[in-house]
Amino acid sequence: MSTPLDHIRNFSIVAHIDHGKSTLADRLIQLTGGLDTREMKDQVLDSMDIERERGITIKAQTVRLSYKAKNGEDYVLNLIDTPGHVDFAYEVSRSLAACEGSLLVVDASQGVEAQTLANVYQAIDNNHEIVVVLNKIDLPAAEPERVKQQIEEVIGIDASDAVEISAKTGLGIEDVLEAIVNKLPAPKEGDRNAPLKAMLVDSWYDSYLGVIVLVRVIDGVLKKGQTIRMMGTGAKYPVERTGVFTPKMVQVDDLGPGELGFITASIKEVADTRVGDTITEDRRPTENMLSGFKPAQPVVFCGLFPVDAADFEDLRGAMGKLRLNDASFSFEMETSAALGFGFRCGFLGLLHLEIIQERLEREFNLDLITTAPSVVYRLNMTDGTHKELHNPADMPDVVKIASIEEPWIKATIMTPDDYLGAIMKLCQERRGIQIDLTYVGPRAMITYDLPLNEVVFDFYDRLKSISKGYASFDYNLSDYREGDLVKMSILVNEEPVDALSMLVHRSAAEKRGRALCEKLKELIPQHMFKIPIQAAIGGRIVARETISALRKDVTAKCYGGDVTRKRKLLEKQKESKKRMRQFGKVEIPQEAFIQALKMGDD
């Protein structure tokens, strides 16, 4: 089964969201005969419905293509289709480490975007050869010459011999295959007889086969019947089957050096298979591990609660199943006075949060409420200890805290000139510090340091609406810095609502509090008594709105008669309302929570 090393090419496709990399992958599969016409469907590698609908790739996928080149030789091309979105950058990093080259796909009508940059720099860090592919050249707006110049200016790689294609119509696809064979390097030397050393690229759960592990063999041979050992965790498993994706699962006898394939080994949980771990044979282990990956750290936290408390156990089961497939998603139980039992969940970013929420609602038919997203704060206590704060409601007494540190990010924004002023204003409003501003033709590239707290709220939506969708945004975490942060509580009828408490910067507290109170005033229905809605910092009220009471006309049955009769009825009503306000409970509808947390829509 084994293919000579110089006839193997391992490559990934790197691009910004929507520049057509999944479509290009479809064409490559079609042209090399991976699937026949009947089995072909659009974005064949995006296996989740949500991936296909949103037109984004979430999990990295792999395919083995067999291609007979124009020089008459047979080649094996292993393609890894990577996600383009910033939240899934860790999926990109591990996919790139399994390859020697990359196709950089750039939309010929739009040019280089912020995430193109981030992913290309990752590819360059992995010493990849890069073949530039200009896609969508059939569009009337395509400007291949301008985009080539832009690639050379911004990224600094030679684009003079870029392959011009249209993945949609299939134009130029064969040139891409030839470029892969001729320009990308074969895998570095691997020894079939050396002890087994393989990198764990990805893993996911299959209800029939257990955990399927995607591996890239470096030295030695992986075959059925071996007992393998994960060097990071020390766990041992017998290999049950080895195979490749074409993109259908096809079993093969063994996987040799340089090859990409999958194994199953009756592994029960994805958490047991750490991405970036080294797999070796238990009987004859390799000496040195591969330089490992950092496991992905959750960045954004929020509470997920079932709308109906009876769904709690179903939600627990559903989250367990998603965790099987997505080790970067973490959750633990929490309770809230307003929302009952639920979970505190950690995500890689806002898109990750949205996708998990949508998958829970879709695949498991659950109705959920999410609380306001928050980031991980570091608390330096007066007694010299340090704590991590995931949920603003758990914040200890202010007297015990010496200082609070919050995470900051380095953000790169690319935008047409026309929107530059508005975007800079937005960044300044969000306490941003400008680091750099460069021009590339008619587009500007700005680098800002921003507090993550200000970005998780609604920054991305605002950026897109200010720039009419033209600006693109990419970020990575830089460090923790001390900030003047305060906890803001929301009181409804003088009762604190824990699900709405948040940490905000002192300068923005009043504005944010007022906006939230106004929003709740619209959303909470009137009761028989008046309801005050207040935003408080410590003991100080910074904003207040009042929902007026519903009034029943108690004097309607008095026709004429003495005024004292009317007054008596009105006084009696007033007394009842006072008592009602004292003992009455304000029911906050679920919609009010959901809307109040989408503060960015005003």
Swiss-Prot record:
Using the UniProt record, give the first listed, main subcellular location.
membrane
**A Pfam family per the record:** GTP_EFTU_D2
Which PROSITE patterns did the record assign?
Answer: G_TR_1, G_TR_2
Instruction: List the catalytic activities from the record.
Output: GTP + H2O = GDP + phosphate + H(+)
Q: What class of enzyme is it?
A: hydrolase
* E.C. designation(s): 3.6.5.n1
State the UniProt keywords alphabetically.
Cell inner membrane, Cell membrane, GTP-binding, Hydrolase, Membrane, Nucleotide-binding, Protein biosynthesis
Q: Name one GO cellular component term.
A: plasma membrane
The record's annotation in SUPFAM superfamilies points to: EF-G C-terminal domain-like, P-loop containing nucleoside triphosphate hydrolases
Localisation = Cell inner membrane
Q: Which residues form the tr-type G domain?
A: 6-188
**BP-aspect Gene Ontology terms:** positive regulation of translation
GO molecular function terms listed in the Swiss-Prot or TrEMBL record: GTP binding; GTPase activity; guanosine tetraphosphate binding; ribosome binding; translation elongation factor activity
- Residues binding GTP: D18, H19, G20, K21, S22, T23, N135, K136, I137, D138
Mode of membrane association:
Peripheral membrane protein
Q: Which InterPro entries match?
A: EF-4, EFG_III/V, EFG_V-like, EFTu-like_2, G_TR_CS, LepA_C_sf, LepA_CTD, LepA_IV
* Superkingdom classification of source: Bacteria
PANTHER family xrefs: TRANSLATION FACTOR GUF1 HOMOLOG, CHLOROPLASTIC, TRANSLATION FACTOR GUF1-RELATED
What family does the entry list? Belongs to the TRAFAC class translation factor GTPase superfamily. Classic translation factor GTPase family. LepA subfamily.
The entry's function note states: Required for accurate and efficient protein synthesis under certain stress conditions. May act as a fidelity factor of the translation reaction, by catalyzing a one-codon backward translocation of tRNAs on improperly translocated ribosomes. Back-translocation proceeds from a post-translocation (POST) complex to a pre-translocation (PRE) complex, thus giving elongation factor G a second chance to translocate the tRNAs correctly. Binds to ribosomes in a GTP-dependent manner.
The molecule here is called: Elongation factor 4
What is the species listed in this Swiss-Prot or TrEMBL entry? Brucella melitensis biotype 2 (strain ATCC 23457)
Mind giving the lineage of the organism this protein is from?
Answer: Bacteria, Pseudomonadati, Pseudomonadota, Alphaproteobacteria, Hyphomicrobiales
